[in-house]
Regions:
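N-terminal amphipathic alpha-helix/helix-capping segment at the start of soluble metabolic enzymes
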Residues: 1-24, 90
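Alpha-helix-loop-beta-strand connector modules within alpha/beta enzyme cores
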Residues: 71-98, 181-207
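Catalytic domains of carbohydrate-active enzymes, especially glycoside hydrolases
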Residues: 40-63, 158-163
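Non-globular sequence segments
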Residues: 96, 102-161
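Conserved, mostly hydrophobic/aromatic
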Residues: 22, 47, 90, 99, ...
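Hydrophobic faces of well-ordered beta-strands that scaffold small-molecule active sites
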Residues: 20-23, 54-56, 97-101, 164-166
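Active-site beta-loop-alpha junctions enriched in small/polar residues
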Residues: 25-27, 102-104, 169-171
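Glycine-rich anion/phosphate-binding loops
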Residues: 32-46, 72-92, 109-114, 139-154, ...
Length: 207
C-alpha cells in the first residue's frame, strides 16, 4: 500500500505533490539589519527540491521581537527585494514557500542587549541570558504588535511567498499569552479564560 506521505495534499489554493515539509530552520546568515544575503540564497537553492512545502527560519516582524541576531527581517519595506530573491530561490523547482513570522517577546535577546529589558504579557524577572526585567505590554502596544504582524504578512506576499507561518510555540510572544505561567493579566487578554489567552493569536489572524 502506498504511504500517505507520498499522497498529494491540498493546502488552501495550493496543491502539493506529497506531504513532506522542510521545517523552519534558523541559519543566522542574514545581515545585522535582517537583509537577505548570498549565503541565505545558496542555502535555499540547495534545498529547493527537498520538499513541496518549505518554511523559512524565524523572520522577525519588529526589532522589539527579534529572536536571532542575524535572522531575516520583515520589519520594513526595504527588506522586500531581498525576500523576493529568497522566495524565488525556495520556489525555483516548484515548491511552495512560507515565511515564519516571529515576535520573540521575553526572549528577544538582541533587543534586550540594546535596551536592557524586553516585553511580555505580564511583568517578570528573568535571569537568562542576563538578569533582566520583562515589561508588561499595554493594550495600545498589543494593537501595535498586531499591526506589525499584518504589515509583515503584506510584505511576505509582496515578496512572492505563498503564505506565512505564525510561530506560536517555544515561549515566544503568542505562546506567552496562552500560558498562565507568563500571562497574569486581568484584562481582555488575561489569564482567566482560554478565550482571553487566545485573543492575541486570533486577532493577529483576523488582521
Amino acid at each position: 500500500m502506498p504511504s500517505p506521505l507520498l499522497s498529494p495534499l491540498g493546502l488552501g489554493a495550493h496543491s502539493l505533490a506529497n506531504r513532506f515539509v522542510l521545517s523552519p530552520m534558523t541559519t543566522n546568515s542574514s545581515t545585522a539589519q535582517g537583509h537577505i544575503t548570498q549565503e541565505d540564497l545558496a542555502y535555499s537553492r540547495r534545498r529547493a527540491q527537498s520538499a513541496p512545502l518549505q518554511i523559512t527560519g524565524a523572520a522577525y516582524i519588529h526589532a522589539q521581537g527579534q529572536l536571532f541576531e542575524f535572522g531575516p527581517s520583515l520589519a520594513e519595506d526595504a527588506c522586500v527585494p531581498g525576500l523576493a530573491k529568497l522566495a524565488q530561490a525556495m520556489q525555483q523547482d516548484g515548491a511552495k514557500a512560507l515565511i515564519q513570522l516571529t515576535h520573540a517577546g521575553r526572549f528577544a535577546e538582541p533587543y534586550l542587549r540594546r535596551q536592557g529589558y524586553v516585553y511580555g504579557p505580564s511583568p517578570m524577572t528573568l535571569n537568562s541570558p542576563i538578569p533582566h526585567q520583562v515589561k508588561a505590554l499595554d493594550q495600545s502596544q498589543i494593537k501595535s504588535i498586531i499591526g506589525y504582524y499584518a504589515d509583515a504578512t503584506r510584505r511576505a506576499i509582496q515578496a512572492g511567498f505563498a503564505g506565512i507561518e505564525l510561530s506560536s510555540a517555544q515561549r515566544l510572544l503568542p505562546q506567552s499569552f496562552l500560558s498562565t505561567f507568563s500571562n497574569q493579566r486581568t484584562d481582555a487578554y488575561g489569564a482567566d479564560s482560554l478565550e482571553n489567552r487566545a485573543r492575541l493569536i486570533l486577532e493577529i489572524w483576523e488582521a
